[in-house]
Regions:
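Short, well-structured N-terminal submotif of metal-dependent ribonuclease cores
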Residues: 1-34, 48-58
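Active-site-proximal, substrate-binding regions of enzyme catalytic domains
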Residues: 40-68
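Acidic, PIN/NYN-like endoribonuclease modules and their adjacent C-terminal/linker elements
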Residues: 97-98, 102-138
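Short, well-ordered coil/turn elements that cap or connect secondary structure elements
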Residues: 26-28, 64, 125-127
Length: 138
C-alpha cells in the first residue's frame, strides 16, 4: 500500500525516540514524499535543529533513495486550491494532500492534519481518495 509521509512525521526520524522507530517502519513500506516535503524537512533541520548542511544533505539523499519523490506540478497546485476550499486546509497542507491523492496513496501520515479525515479529489466518482492518519496515535 502506497503511503505519503508528511514533513511533521519525518522530523521525528532524526530523533532518538520511539517515534523515530515508527517513522523507520513507515519508510520501510512503499513510502511517498514530494519535493515540498524534502524542502520543508531540510528547512526545519537547518533552522530549528541547527543541523550542519552536510548532515542535512545526507538525510535528504537517504529519503530520495528510499522514497518515491514526487515533483511539484501545476496539476498538484490546481488540485490543492480546490482542496483548500473543500477541507479548509492551508495552501501547504493542501499541496501535500493533493500530491498524496494524485499519486494514488491510500493513506497520508501526518501529525498535524485531522486524523481520520477522508479526502476525495474533485470530479465524478473519483478513484483518488485517501485517509489522513496520525501514525503516533494509539
Amino acid at each position: 500500500m502506497k503511503a505519503f509521509i508528511d514533513t511533521n512525521v519525518l522530523i521525528y526520524w532524526v530523533d532518538d525516540s520511539a517515534r523515530a522507530d515508527v517513522v523507520e517502519q513507515l519508510l520501510a513500506q512503499e513510502a511517498v514524499i514530494s519535493v515540498q516535503v524534502l524542502n520543508e524537512f531540510a528547512n526545519v533541520l537547518r533552522r530549528k535543529r541547527a543541523m550542519a548542511l552536510p548532515d542535512v544533505e545526507v538525510l535528504c539523499t537517504t529519503l530520495i533513495d528510499t522514497c518515491d519523490v514526487l515533483d511539484l506540478s501545476v496539476r498538484t497546485h490546481q488540485t490543492a486550491l480546490t482542496l483548500m476550499a473543500r477541507y479548509n486546509l492551508s495552501v501547504y497542507d493542501a499541496n501535500i494532500v493533493a500530491a498524496a491523492a494524485l499519486s494514488d496513496c491510500a493513506v497520508l501520515y501526518s501529525e498535524d492534519m485531522q486524523d481520520g479525515l477522508n479526502v476525495k479529489l474533485p470530479g465524478p466518482a473519483s478513484a483518488n481518495a485517501l485517509v489522513i492518519r496520525n501514525p503516533f496515535r494509539a
